[in-house]
């Protein structure tokens, strides 16, 4: 190992074999031995500072790196200085000889100027791309009234003139076209109705470029004779960019088009309608929006939108009879049915028409007269009309019908007096209302819908609500509407006179009020009204606890009770379970209820109508008679009611208004003692079991 200037050297074999310390070879080339570990990047000065506790040096020593950079910078500067000195010594600019260094620089500086001169000469003789006049110079020269243009040095910039032909580069000045604002300002001083066939911007109309051939065509069509004849200057003389022999191309304007714009000579006259701004392009709205949108009509039509609705005749008829009933358009079937109801001749054909109206229950809204059962074809034609498809959806029927009922109840309360007269004077109307209420109450939901919207098939039930669903609009309900204009769903509420009945305090949770006013026709026992059954059960609950079965049978067959219940359409078949009232004032309420319910029965004077339904009365009264086997229990000469027995049927006639029998079991028990004293422990136990079974 040889140590030279602090660096160790050894032969290559000894370095590979890790025998550096014992290497003494002299016949082989020596190599520098790398120091072990990482090389130290800290200078000696920084090492000394780290040993000193008082000093706080930086973590990384940059002294060596900075010195290297400084040394490299010095070397570069010295090399530049030497090169300059050498050029100075070899420069022969002062002598006749050509200098090697400075002559080359001068040639590089002079070459653009020579090409610039060539470009100018070529552009003047054969212009490759000629630029039109700028907007500022065009406005200033046209509005000043002088024919002489400003110098072309202000128009043709140096960037355009420096471009050599054939290089393939187009300067951005070529794309400069007079802006629309400059054109509008140019034309603002003149009338907008002036004909554009007289050219007002000669550079635009006198210059055209053919992109296929690359030729520039200049036409000075009557420019020197039209506007600039006063000053004696022509566009051709003042413009350097135009060639001298431009007259040979006067007829080229018809063959070529101008750059980016049509010729002003071909433009139309500006009318006052389209004089918003010169240069604007008007695009018709039908180009983007169809001329006839569904439900909107023609977009550009200035007429009212009322005439643009594409309604068919059937839709207009259905819509007018429901939504615009107050405007007088609903004249289709209303007058006919009003005359039918108010007429004094009650023939069989009229009654058949009335029953047909009640059974099919189209109620003069969907169509007039003969079209009641033939509306399906017109409804199917308009299934794709958007808004009407929503109303045919069965999910929206219940919500809209509920709102319709509320509106009809509010309106119907204002017509109490008129309906009382019609109800009392027209027995035919009472018969119609009776059959209608019976068809509504005693049929299931599907059968009611079937009877309400006509004898339709599977898909016609939802379609019948098409016009009905449009009714609950508070804007379209008239102040006074007739009875025949009512919707089918609210007939059972609004067609009867509004006689408010006292609220029942029955313990039955399923208690319902009787939906119809008292009439003379009783229903079959299979369609028993729940409200009537619960009412009668409450009345019989007192006697069922402390009386024999014979007394119950006597009370059921008592003519006074039958007369009282005949105004509520039905009598229950049998009493299976007793019921007890909750309050002590139950008996008084029952007495007042029976008095009020029996009052409307006195309005009926025609007993012959009751003979139309002997079978129904027979079906109603036959089970109690057979089950109890007590025909002698009927008191025919009772003070409260009379019975006419014809074969198997029995018809009750109303008695006096306030004649309550004093001998009936119900009245005797009600006046005897309060119900709290009638119950024993066994009675309370039975009542508890009965309530738990409910």
UniProtKB/Swiss-Prot annotation:
Residues 1-40 bind DNA. SMART domains: Copper-fist (SM01090), Cu_FIST (SM00412). Residues 350-378 have a biased composition (Low complexity). Residues 104-128, 209-240, 332-388, 479-514, 566-588, 650-677 are annotated as: Disordered. Residues 111-126, 336-349, 566-577, 664-677 have a biased composition (Polar residues). One of its GO terms (molecular function) is copper ion binding. It holds the Pfam family Copper-fist. The modification Phosphoserine is found at residues 125, 231, 241, 291. It is found in: Nucleus. Zn(2+) binds at residues 11, 14, 23, 25. It comes from the Eukaryota. InterPro entries: Copper_Homeo_Regul (IPR051763), Cu_fist_DNA-bd_dom (IPR001083), Cu_fist_DNA-bd_dom_sf (IPR036395). One of its GO terms (biological process) is positive regulation of transcription by RNA polymerase II. GO terms for cellular component: cytoplasm; nucleus. Keywords: Activator, Copper, DNA-binding, Metal-binding, Nucleus, Phosphoprotein, Transcription, Transcription regulation, Zinc. SUPFAM superfamilies: Zinc domain conserved in yeast copper-regulated transcription factors. Present with 339 molecules/cell in log phase SD medium. Regulates the transcription of a set of genes, many of which encode membrane proteins. Among the genes regulated are YGR138C and YRO2. Does not seem to be dependent on copper. This is Transcriptional activator HAA1. It comes from Saccharomyces cerevisiae (strain ATCC 204508 / S288c) (Baker's yeast).
């Amino acid at each position: 190992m040889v140590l030279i200037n602090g660096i160790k050297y050894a032969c290559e074999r000894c370095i590979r074999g890790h025998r550096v310390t014992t290497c003494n070879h002299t016949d082989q080339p020596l190599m520098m031995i790398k120091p072990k570990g990482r090389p130290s990047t800290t200078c000696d000065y920084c090492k000394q500072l780290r040993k000193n506790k008082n000093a706080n040096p930086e973590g990384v020593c940059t002294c060596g790196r900075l010195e290297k950079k400084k040394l490299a910078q010095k070397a570069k500067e010295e090399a530049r200085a030497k090169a300059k000195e050498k050029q100075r010594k070899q420069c022969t600019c002062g002598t006749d000889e050509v200098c090697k260094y400075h002559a080359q620089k001068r040639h590089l500086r002079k070459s653009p100027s020579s090409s610039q001169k060539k470009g100018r000469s070529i552009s003047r003789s054969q212009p490759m791309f000629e630029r039109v006049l700028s907007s500022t110079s065009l406005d200033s020269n046209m509005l000043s009234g002088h024919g002489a243009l400003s110098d072309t040095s202000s128009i043709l910039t140096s960037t355009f003139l420096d471009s050599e032909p054939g290089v393939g580069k187009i300067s951005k000045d070529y794309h400069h076209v007079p802006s629309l604002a400059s054109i509008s300002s140019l034309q603002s001083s003149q009338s907008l109705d002036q004909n554009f066939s007289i050219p007002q911007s000669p550079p635009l109309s006198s210059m055209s470029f053919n992109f296929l051939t690359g030729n520039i065509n200049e036409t000075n069509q009557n420019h020197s004779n039209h506007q600039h004849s006063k000053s004696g200057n022509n566009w051709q003389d003042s413009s350097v960019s135009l060639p001298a022999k431009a007259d040979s191309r006067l007829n080229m304007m018809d063959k070529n088009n101008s750059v980016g714009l049509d010729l002003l000579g071909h433009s139309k006259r500006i009318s006052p309608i389209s004089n918003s701004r010169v240069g604007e392009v008007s695009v018709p709205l039908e180009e983007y929006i169809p001329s006839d949108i569904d439900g909107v009509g023609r977009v550009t039509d200035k007429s009212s939108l009322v005439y643009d609705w594409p309604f068919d005749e059937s839709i207009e008829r259905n819509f007018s009879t429901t939504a615009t009933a107050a405007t007088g358009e609903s004249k289709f079937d209303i007058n006919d049915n009003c005359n039918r109801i108010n007429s004094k001749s009650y023939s069989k054909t009229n009654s058949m028409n009335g029953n047909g109206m009640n059974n099919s229950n189209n109620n003069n809204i969907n169509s007039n007269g003969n079209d009641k059962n033939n509306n399906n074809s017109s409804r199917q034609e308009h299934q794709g009309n958007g808004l009407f498809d929503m109303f045919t959806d069965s999910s929206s029927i219940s919500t809209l019908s509920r709102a319709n009922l509320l509106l009809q109840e509010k309106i119907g309360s204002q017509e109490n007096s008129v309906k009382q007269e019609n109800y009392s004077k027209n027995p035919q109307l009472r018969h119609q209302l009776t059959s209608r209420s019976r068809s509504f109450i005693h049929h299931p939901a599907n059968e009611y819908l079937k009877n309400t919207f006509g004898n339709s098939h599977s898909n016609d039930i939802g379609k019948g609500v098409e016009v009905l669903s449009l009714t609950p609009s508070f804007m379209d309900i008239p102040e006074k509407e007739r009875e025949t204009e009512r919707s089918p769903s609210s007939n059972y509420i609004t067609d009867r006179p509004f006689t408010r009945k006292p609220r029942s305090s029955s313990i039955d949770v399923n208690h319902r009020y009787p939906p119809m006013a008292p009439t003379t026709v009783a229903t079959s026992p299979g369609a028993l009204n729940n409200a009537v059954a619960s009412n009668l059960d409450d009345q019989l609950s007192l006697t069922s606890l402390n009386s024999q079965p014979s007394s119950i049978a006597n009370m059921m067959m008592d003519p006074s009770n039958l007369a009282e219940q005949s105004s509520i359409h039905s009598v229950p078949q049998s009493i299976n379970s007793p019921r007890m009232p909750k309050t002590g004032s139950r008996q008084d309420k029952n007495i007042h209820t029976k008095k009020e319910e029996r009052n409307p029965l006195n309005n009926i004077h025609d007993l012959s109508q009751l003979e139309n339904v002997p079978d129904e009365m027979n079906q109603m009264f036959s089970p109690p008679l057979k089950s109890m086997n007590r025909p002698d229990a009927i008191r025919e000469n009772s003070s409260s009611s009379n019975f006419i027995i014809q074969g198997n049927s029995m018809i009750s006639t109303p008695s006096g208004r306030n004649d309550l029998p004093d001998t009936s079991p119900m009245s005797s028990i009600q006046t005897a003692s309060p119900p709290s004293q009638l119950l024993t422990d066994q009675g309370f136990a039975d009542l508890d079991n009965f309530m738990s079974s409910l």
